[in-house]
From Swiss-Prot:
Region annotation RNA binding: where it falls in the sequence: 246-252
Keyword Transit peptide: no
Reactions that this protein is recorded to catalyse: 7-aminomethyl-7-carbaguanine + guanosine(34) in tRNA = 7-aminomethyl-7-carbaguanosine(34) in tRNA + guanine
Residues annotated to bind Zn(2+): 303, 305, 308, 334
Pfam families xrefs: TGT
Function, in words: Catalyzes the base-exchange of a guanine (G) residue with the queuine precursor 7-aminomethyl-7-deazaguanine (PreQ1) at position 34 (anticodon wobble position) in tRNAs with GU(N) anticodons (tRNA-Asp, -Asn, -His and -Tyr). Catalysis occurs through a double-displacement mechanism. The nucleophile active site attacks the C1' of nucleotide 34 to detach the guanine base from the RNA, forming a covalent enzyme-RNA intermediate. The proton acceptor active site deprotonates the incoming PreQ1, allowing a nucleophilic attack on the C1' of the ribose to form the product.
InterPro entries: ArchSynthase1/Queuine_TRR, TGT, TGT-like_sf, tRNA_ribo_trans-like
Cofactor note: Binds 1 zinc ion per subunit.
Active-site feature positions: 92 (proton acceptor), 265 (nucleophile)
Record keywords: Glycosyltransferase, Metal-binding, Queuosine biosynthesis, Transferase, tRNA processing, Zinc
Name of encoding gene: tgt
GO biological process, one term: queuosine biosynthetic process
Protein name as catalogued: Queuine tRNA-ribosyltransferase
């Protein structure tokens, strides 16, 4: 029996306003989850994440399993005890990271054998091992182990990949056993609507605490992503959280909420920050461009983050040029605050019954 509870508070069209409750805290949805691959959101402390409004973060099963290993994390009680984040944590299953290894992996019915990116030793990961690792991490939301279908994939390839993921989903559920953490199933099927339907039907049969859409934002054109979202999101169970994995840009988030998605994660705000790409209410600023060298305005006059209240574009340009660590940190604080503020604005618009109006205005002003 899971300790998670989901309340659907309000709907506007397909867009949903909800709340996910855990013993460690509530998550107001739609929600964006900052990614803490190795247990930390790069350059930020748990206090800073809370200040910007994050209520849940994501940890990476694959990377934490390889380093430092679950024995060390278990000595701290859980990943929460290890990294000092006392609110909910979602851990992915490691399936996407294995997919990212490409030719360095060998896939069988049992699981995946691959060379460790740390020391090149031979490593084996299966649904059962993934569930045990996530149990050891003590995460609040556990993702079932799947194979992320590559793009492009023929219909035959997408079908075989999806069917393997469904067999692994069943094994994940069995291995999850009496773990009170929530277990989410992942819909696969590539760019083929009928395969997505088959996948969702099988996952409903197995029965999960929440449902995720996987295999998007893997290199496909934006119109394909929207087509699959249009087809799939509203068919997911109404009474359970809906999670779109690894997406995306601010526009992607607004468009996915419009189609009925509740939860998101993406490395984009933090990774882009380190490369000098800043999200603002009017679009993206590339802070290393020379035009910002003597620009004394803040990154975004509509933002109340620490960076915008205290520093100019000129200073941030200087930090970027001199490769100062502080530059990456200040950019990350801003970008993740921007994402959390966007989710707050979306939730407020849904609360007030004006989300479709908000969406139109946002898509018109955000370049």
């Amino acid at each position: 029996m899971t300790v998670m509870k989901f309340d659907l508070i309000k709907k506007e069209g397909k867009a949903r306003r909800g709340k996910i409750t855990f013993p460690r805290g509530d998550i107001q949805t739609p929600a964006f989850m900052p990614v803490g691959t190795y247990g930390a959101v790069k350059s930020l402390s748990p206090v800073e994440l809370k200040e910007m409004g994050a209520e849940i973060i994501l940890g990476n099963t694959f990377h934490l399993w390889l380093r430092p290993g679950t024995e060390i994390i278990k000595k701290h009680g859980s990943l929460h005890g290890f990294n000092g984040w006392d609110k909910p944590i979602l851990t992915d299953s490691g399936g996407f990271q294995v997919f990212s290894l490409g030719k360095m992996r060998k896939l069988t019915e049992e699981g995946v054998t691959f060379k460790s990116p740390i020391n090149s030793s031979k490593v084996f990961l299966s649904p059962e091992i993934s569930m045990q690792v996530q149990r050891d991490l003590g995460s609040d939301i556990v993702m079932c182990f799947d194979e992320c279908t590559p793009y492009p994939a023929t219909e035959k390839e997408a079908k075989e990949s999806m069917e393997l993921s469904m067999r692994w989903a069943k094994r994940s559920k069995e291995a999850h056993g009496d773990n009170p953490s929530a277990l989410f199933g992942i819909i696969q099927g590539g760019m083929y609507e009928h395969l997505r339907d088959e996948s969702l039907a099988k996952l409903k049969e197995i029965d999960f605490d929440g449902f995720a859409i996987g295999g998007l934002s893997v290199g496909e054109p934006k119109e394909d992503m929207i087509r699959i979202l249009d087809h799939t999101a509203h068919q997911m169970p109404e009474d359970k959280p809906r999670y779109l994995m690894g997406v995306g840009t601010p526009k992607d988030l607004v468009e996915a909420v419009y189609r009925g998605v509740d939860m998101f994660d993406c490395v984009m705000p933090s990774r882009n920050a380190r490369n000098g790409h800043i999200f603002t209410s009017e679009g993206v600023i590339k802070i290393r461009n020379s035009k910002y060298k003597d620009d004394t305005s803040p990154l975004d006059p509509n933002c109340d983050c620490y960076t915008c209240k205290n520093f100019t574009k000129s200073y941030l340009h200087h930090l970027d040029k001199t490769k100062e660590i502080l530059g990456s940190r200040l950019n990350t604080i801003h970008n993740l605050t921007f994402y959390q503020n966007l989710m707050k604005s979306i939730r407020k618009a849904l609360d007030e019954g004006r989300f479709s109006e908000f969406r139109k205005e946002f898509l018109a002003s955000y370049k």
